């Protein structure tokens, strides 16, 4: 029988983590001089990478349940006077307790046992906890028409890819390499752009489900008319940093990474398809992820969700 503090993952979490693991192997192994097309390169490190990502997905699912429960019950996680049914309240309380009481402790213990835990990995896991806290705070604020700070929004979007950084740091530890800070810096900028791209692709769904989404946050902060231009400015600044960092990479590595981005685009990966050229004065994006398109913003999210619910009800009848 497993101990209470033993890290364990479910099959569903492993299945959900699959696409992230594939993307990580295809996009990050090259930074370690490894060929993802050679099975021995993948399977040597896959158990630790798969277990870690699956555990993170498992915790992320619990956090999503809290956010979605807040949406469906029109309640705020931290400060709600509304009463839930007794059984539901107990379950909700347990989920909150798990996320508030060092959710990564079992994983940390497991990695320590394997001799893989470093202070840098521990720090990234703490960033993951911080992201989930910010996600709950910001989504609750949107739902309850409360003010949000743009500093919190930008902090959250930069923390969001913490799992990729954890996996990358684990790979450094397993291969015995010294962490390459130049590569980490380049990848952090690329991760930011991919997260923004994902948010633009998932915008309408994130409004419906009350998920963290940078465009939603910009609409609340700057208003529906100004949000697209402000986000376009943010993307342009990140693209400029990306281009400068790309020039610092080894030419062969730079070529391989850009080729990987092109492959992902052809495969229809939503992370690699976006565009804000109309908001950049007609400028074509220089980022290898392609050009950008910001979807029409939803000024009144509550009305949007209500109308969608009415439409689905009419379809049923």
Q: Can you describe what each PLM-predicted range is?
A:
Residues 150-163, 214-223, 241-248, 281-301:
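Hydrophobic transmembrane alpha-helix bundles
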Residues 211-237, 256-266:
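C-terminal, helix-dominated tail/subdomain
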Residues 124, 250-257:
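Acidic carboxylate-rich catalytic motifs and surrounding loops in phosphoryl-/glycosyl-chemistry enzymes
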Residues 261-317:
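Acidic, carboxylate-rich catalytic segments that either coordinate divalent cations
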Residues 117-118, 244-247, 254:
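Short helix/loop segments within enzyme catalytic domains
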Residues 169, 173, 192-195, 201, ...:
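Hydrophobic alpha-helix feature that most strongly marks membrane-spanning transmembrane helices
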Residues 1-207, 272-275, 282, 286:
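All-alpha helical catalytic cores of prenyl diphosphate-utilizing isoprenoid enzymes
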């Amino acid at each position: 029988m497993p101990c209470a503090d033993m890290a364990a993952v479910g099959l569903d979490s492993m299945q959900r983590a699959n696409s992230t693991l594939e993307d990580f192997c295809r996009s990050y192994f090259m930074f370690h001089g490894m060929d993802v097309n050679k099975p021995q390169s993948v399977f040597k490190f896959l158990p630790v990478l798969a277990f870690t990502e699956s555990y993170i997905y498992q915790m992320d699912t619990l956090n999503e349940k809290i956010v979605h429960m807040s949406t469906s019950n029109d309640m705020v996680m931290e400060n709600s006077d509304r009463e839930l049914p007794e059984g539901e309240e107990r379950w909700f309380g347990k989920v909150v307790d798990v996320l508030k009481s060092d959710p990564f402790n079992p994983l940390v213990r497991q990695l320590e046992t394997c001799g893989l835990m470093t202070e840098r990995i521990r720090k990234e896991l703490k960033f993951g906890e911080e992201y989930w806290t910010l996600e709950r705070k910001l989504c609750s604020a949107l739902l309850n028409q409360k003010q949000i700070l743009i500093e919190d929004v930008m902090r959250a979007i930069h923390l969001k890819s913490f799992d990729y950084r954890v996996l990358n740091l684990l790979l450094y530890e397993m291969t015995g390499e010294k962490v390459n800070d130049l590569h980490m810096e380049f990848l952090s900028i690329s991760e930011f752009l991919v997260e923004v791209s994902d948010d633009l692709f998932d915008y309408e769904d994130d409004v419906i489900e009350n998920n963290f989404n940078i465009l939603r946050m910009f609409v609340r902060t700057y208003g529906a008319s100004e949000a697209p231009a402000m986000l376009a400015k943010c993307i342009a600044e990140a693209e400029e940093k990306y281009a400068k960092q790309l020039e610092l990479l080894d030419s062969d590595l730079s070529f391989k990474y850009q080729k990987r981005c092109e492959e992902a685009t052809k495969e229809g990966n939503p992370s690699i398809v976006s565009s804000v050229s109309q908001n950049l004065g007609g400028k074509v994006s220089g980022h290898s992820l392609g050009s950008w398109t910001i979807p029409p913003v939803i000024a009144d999210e509550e009305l949007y969700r209500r109308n969608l619910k009415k439409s689905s009800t009419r379809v049923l009848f």
